[in-house]
Regions:
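Non-heme di-metal
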Residues: 1-199
Length: 199
């Protein structure tokens, strides 16, 4: 039994939100003309389905039920976004996908913090890897639009772009942490103090 209401809700929400993201990427991949972009976005969709599966594994470990409310809510959101990708042009799907992924990075590190606060470190490696994968997604989308003429205007109003992010992870550096299974390397660092990652 997991006695942490915030963590339970975060797990339920993440599980359903990953489905919304996967649906959105289905529409995004279908809307682009470049075959390489289609392939890359479809791989990101696969990553989201895998994350959903991994979150469910954690939920099952604690007999946490799936939220019907979140499932319906994010199903609708995902399908609406998927359809909209065909009518809003090339730039906007890439921009808002990157912005979304930027925030998702923090969610998995927040899960780790919550687990650690109640003495559980079993999922440290999994949650780090999921957070890092979301960061890789963010960087992919940003690289696609970083020189686009619309980006400065969107960044000004939506607070994400070349100069702003919703996390402070740097994939060019490494951090080591120990777990019961040994030492693991992860390709990230903090621009500020390590503890700031979990605020």
């Amino acid at each position: 039994m997991l006695n942490h209401p915030q963590l339970i809700d975060l797990l339920k929400k993440a599980y359903s939100a990953e489905k919304a993201a996967a649906f959105a990427y289905q529409g995004h991949a279908a809307s682009v003309k470049d075959e390489m972009e289609k392939k890359e976005i479809r791989q990101i969709e696969i990553d989201e389905w895998l994350h959903r599966k991994e979150v469910l594994q954690i939920m099952n470990d604690f007999n946490i039920s799936i939220s019907k409310h979140y499932e319906l809510k994010f199903y609708i959101i995902g399908k609406v976004i998927s359809a909209s990708c065909h009518i809003i042009g090339w730039f906007m799907p890439f921009y808002f996908a990157g912005r979304l992924e930027s925030g998702n990075v923090c969610e998995y590190f927040r899960m780790k913090q919550y687990f650690n606060s109640i003495g559980i470190s079993t999922y440290d490696k999994m949650l780090y890897e999921m957070g890092i994968k979301e960061k890789e997604h963010e960087i992919y989308f940003l690289e696609k639009i970083k020189t686009n003429k619309f980006l400065p205007y969107y960044e000004k109003y939506f607070s994400w772009g070349n100069n702003q992010s919703f996390n402070n992870i740097d994939l060019d550096k490494k951090y080591i942490f120990r777990s019961r299974e040994g030492i693991y390397w992860f390709l990230f660092s903090l621009k500020n103090k390590f503890r700031a990652l979990f605020l």
